[in-house]
Amino acid sequence: MLQALLDSKDFLALTLANPQTLGDEFSFTLGEHTRVNVWDTGVIVFEPAQPQGKDVILSCGVHGNETAPIELCNTLIKQLLQQKIIAKQRTLFLIGNPLAINNGTRIIDENMNRLFSGEHSNPPGLVNPERLRAKKLETYVDRFFKAAAAGRQRIHYDLHTAMRASKHEKFAIYPYRPGRAYSAEQIMFLAASGVDTVLFHHEPTTTFSYFSSEQYGADAFTIELGKVYPMGQNDMTRFIAAQEMFTRLITDKPLQLESFSTDKVNLYQVCRVINKHFDDFEFTFATDVENFRAFPKGFVLAREGGQEIKVEQEVESIVFPNAKVPIGNRTVICLIPSVAPDVR
C-alpha cells in the first residue's frame, strides 16, 4: 500500500481500490517537513514538523455521488504528496463513503450524514456500511483533535454538492451552537472561497459538521459547492476560489479576508424543519424546484395524512426538498432572511 501511494501520489485511487480497508496503518515522511499518516482507507493526516496553530479537517464523499469535493480534496492531497505545496497546519483528509463512491450512488443503505453524534449505534445499530463508517469517522476526528495541544483552533469543512440547482450556487450550513458566537472570520473565509451564502441552523442535528462543532468546539460547516455531477464531469474551474483558500489555510499563507459585512454575504436563519409522518407525503411544487425558492405566507407547501402544511412566515425559502425520505426523516428545511445573529 505504501509503495503504491508513493508511486502514484493518488490517494483517491488507493482508497477506491480498497474501499473497506487498507489493512494496517502506515506512515512516511516528506522531506524533513511533514509526517504523513494513513489511518484507514480514505483517511490521511499531514503532520508538519513545526505546526502552526490550527487543526484542519477537510471531509468529502460522505455521499458517494457528490464528486466535485472528492476531486478537489484529491487534488490537494496530490499536491501535498508531490510537495508542490507544504502543509504548515495539521490537516486531516477524510473520504467519507468509498463504497458509495465506487457505486456511483449517494448512499449504499442509509444517509450517512444523519448518523453522527452516536446516531450510528442507536436502534437498529451497526447494521449497514454507512453506520459502521460513521462510527469510524467519529473516532478519527476524535483522535486527530485530541492528538494536539489544547487551545489550538479546530476547523472542519464537510464538503458536499447538492442534488438540485440553486439560486445561490454555493452555500454553507452553520451548525447550531448555543452560547457560542458565530465567527465573522469564518464567514468571510467562506465568502472568499466562493461560498457567499450561510444558513444558521436552529437546533441540534446528527450531521458530521454538527458533531465536530458540538463535541470539539470546532469551527465546522456543511458546505455545498454546487450541483452533483458524475466523477470526471465537473467543471473544476468553478472551484478555483475554494481550492485557493483551502491551500492558503493549510499552508499558512495570508488569508487576506475582507472585514465582515452583511452586504457581502447572504444570511438565512432556519425557521423550521418539516419531517415526514405519513407515506402519502407530497410537495405541491415541481420536483425540480431550485434551492432557495421563496414562497409567501399561506402557500401550501405539502400535504400528508389529510393535512396541509403551509408557509407560516411572511416569506419562507426552502432548501433540500425531498419527499422520498423514510418516515421520520427531514423532507425540507425552511428559511427566513437573517440579520446577522451574534457574529464576532
UniProtKB/Swiss-Prot annotation:
Q: Which residues bind Zn(2+)?
A: H63, E66, H160
Q: Would the keyword Transcription turn up in this protein's UniProt record?
A: no
Q: What pathway annotation does it carry?
A: Amino-acid degradation; L-arginine degradation via AST pathway; L-glutamate and succinate from L-arginine: step 5/5
Concerning CDD domains, the annotation shows: M14_ASTE (cd03855)
The cofactor remark states: Binds 1 zinc ion per subunit.
What does the record give as the active site?
A: E224
| Highest taxon listed in the record's lineage | Bacteria
Record field: catalytic activity: N-succinyl-L-glutamate + H2O = L-glutamate + succinate
State the top-level EC class. hydrolase
Under Enzyme Commission nomenclature, its number is 3.5.1.96
Name the cofactor(s) required for activity, per the record: Zn(2+)
Q: Which GO terms describe its molecular function?
A: hydrolase activity, acting on carbon-nitrogen (but not peptide) bonds, in linear amides; hydrolase activity, acting on ester bonds; succinylglutamate desuccinylase activity; zinc ion binding
User: Could you mention a single GO BP entry for this protein?
Assistant: arginine catabolic process to succinate
User: Which key words tag this protein in UniProt?
Assistant: Arginine metabolism, Hydrolase, Metal-binding, Zinc
Cross-referenced PANTHER family: ASPARTOACYLASE, SUCCINYLGLUTAMATE DESUCCINYLASE
What this chain does, per the entry, is described as: Transforms N(2)-succinylglutamate into succinate and glutamate.
Which family is this protein grouped under? Belongs to the AspA/AstE family. Succinylglutamate desuccinylase subfamily.
Its protein name is Succinylglutamate desuccinylase
Source organism (scientific name): Shewanella oneidensis (strain ATCC 700550 / JCM 31522 / CIP 106686 / LMG 19005 / NCIMB 14063 / MR-1)
Gene name linked to the record: astE
